[in-house]
Amino acid sequence: MATESNPALASLPSNVREIIELASQRDGGIPFRAKTAHVHRTWAGTFTSLPELYIQPESVSEIQKVVRLARHARRRVTTTGCGHSPSDITCTSSWLVNLDNFNKVISVDHLTGLVVVQAGIRLYQLSDELDRRGLALPSLGSINEQSIAGAISTGTHGSGIKHGLVGESITELKITLANGETLSCSPEDKPDLFRAALISLGALGIITEVTFKAVPAFSLAWSQAIDSDKRIFEKWEKDLWSQAEFVRIWWFPYMRRAAVWTANVVDPVDLKTGAVKHREPPTSYYDSWLGYYVYHNLLALSRWIPRITPWIEWFVFGMQYGFKNGEVTRIGAVQPSQKAFLLNCLYSQSVNEWAIPLHKGPEALQRLGAWLQNLKPGDPGYVEHGIPYSAEGLWVHSPVEVRASDSTVYTSREANTRPFLDPTQSDGPTLYLNAIMYRPYHREPTYNATERYYLGFEWLMRELGGKPHWAKTFTATQADLARWYGDDFQRWGAVRESVDPEGMFVGPWHRRYLLEPLQRDRLLPLEEIQQTTKKVPARQGGGIEVIGIQNLVAPN
């Protein structure tokens, strides 16, 4: 699409316009669906950027054209979906590709369960398409807004020790590389590329096609029970995580209580009538817009009076689950799986999630709770937390989301199915702890509460042998990650180097965590580096604007 048919491109540098126009004359009219003046913002409003071009291709040939043009124009390419990662991984001042219009189901084999889809399809769209065909994904996380490529690329997971990462059912991928070529990879064909692409972090190319094994559609009967954290810890090594196929917990540190969600597969069909008997959970007036805004405004108030934060936890917990002590089953339902897994994330938030060995969960939560509550010897629930940072005057939001999985059930290094950058345990079940700090009305908590909380939280996670979730907030360094992942880290880097030697898909986030520390004489030719950042006013969405600059080394 030349600039004559797309006047918005007239604002581009003349050399870039000429490259696009020349390519449009020679490629048989393959569209280049690009626009300028797009503002990219993460879902949480934590980061924004102003890409030079925002491009929404609708076919593999269009994606290949984007990559070829970027190579000739000496531009970095970043891919984004819903922007649910609160980090700056998708921020760019160069070319931003969104695959929302590349979202079709290509084929479904009901005999094998193999489904082939275009990589831009969102998980909610995919779930609906599968349901219409009597199929489902084996497991989902708490949200379904991500594209399937984004969920794969960042290691999205659900919660249940019979399941691992959402990407565990992937059997084949197609990816468009920096040279414009689209390759297939699988455990048998180009296994190193496959293992690298399963958690690619957007640094290898653009995933275009995903083949995975679906399962017959299923419904879940779930219930939610309230218990003290002491009893949760007592049940931990008994049947806490094996009592149902899917289990997740929300822990409230100030109240020292938890909501335990359990779900099992059921057949909701009435044998007499043949009717499907789904049942929605009971609701109250507080579950409406009233509760949403009451909680939001209480969080906003706590920015100015942080000491009321534990009271807010008590009030919101009571309104949702009841104010009585002891175990109380509050709600239950029977829903289609793609609906039962979902959780309302409510408001803008920072999230910091780490994966540790499952058996270390009670120790982690007890030590974290003792630190947050400033417990002293003799206080109920006191343990020596060992965290070398003060929590005096620190008040944090709740809950801490607690989930578990076991990626060893379906994946292994030997079978070439375990991602190189899989943060889960390679020898047993994994526990995920997700520390949330809300940003009411897109404003950060005061008194550096988020930074202080995450400083202590990450110190504890490191001590317990943890690794951070790639899509969330963390402060580990490249050296830390290289040490934790060992040979797999080096092998992932070798694949990246082989498929993108000029760094077309490399930005500041990748340099920070995956590449050697920045040295001017060792920049990749197409790498984008961070030039500066600036705060965005809350009335404009808040967060930090990331401004990058290309290395722009001419090709040899």
UniProtKB/Swiss-Prot annotation:
Source organism per UniProt: Neurospora crassa (strain ATCC 24698 / 74-OR23-1A / CBS 708.71 / DSM 1257 / FGSC 987)
Primary subcellular site in the record, as a coarse category: mitochondrion
Name of protein: Putative D-arabinono-1,4-lactone oxidase
Membrane-spanning ranges: none
KW Mitochondrion (keyword) present: yes
Residue positions, PTM Pros-8alpha-FAD histidine: 84
UniProt gene name: alo-1
Biological or metabolic pathway of the protein: Cofactor biosynthesis; D-erythroascorbate biosynthesis; dehydro-D-arabinono-1,4-lactone from D-arabinose: step 2/2
GO molecular-function terms, A-Z: D-arabinono-1,4-lactone oxidase activity; FAD binding; myosin V binding
Annotated compartments: Mitochondrion membrane
Catalyses which reaction(s): D-arabinono-1,4-lactone + O2 = dehydro-D-arabinono-1,4-lactone + H2O2 + H(+)
